[in-house]
A protein has these predicted regions:
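Amphipathic, interaction-prone secondary-structure segments
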Residues: 18-47
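Intrinsically disordered, low-complexity regulatory segments enriched in Ser/Thr/Pro
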Residues: 39-65
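Catalytic cores of nucleic-acid endonucleases
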Residues: 71-73
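Negatively charged, low-complexity tracts enriched in Asp/Glu with abundant Ser/Thr
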Residues: 1-29, 59-68
Length: 76
């Protein structure tokens, strides 16, 4: 079973491998940027992902609560 902390680390590792820049904002959010794309992942403590938003050119595109969808966004 994967814990939330492992999930957060797993997303951070994947983002790094794929060339994304990661910034931690307020200890609760991870912001990934690559070119004009930004992904913001909000965490409820370190226990679970609250949700994530995808932006292109600072325009909101999509929202999810599914870590697998965030992985797909990072792989684009």
């Amino acid at each position: 079973m994967t814990t939330a902390t492992d999930e957060r680390s797993s997303l951070a590792d994947l983002g790094g491998e794929l060339g994304w820049t990661r910034r931690v904002s307020n200890e609760r959010a991870d912001v990934y940027t690559k070119g004009t794309v930004r992904i913001r992942v909000i965490w409820a403590g370190d226990e679970q992902m609250s949700g994530s938003s995808l932006f292109h050119d600072e325009m909101y595109e999509s929202y999810t609560r599914d870590p697998n969808t965030v992985r797909a966004w990072l792989r684009r």
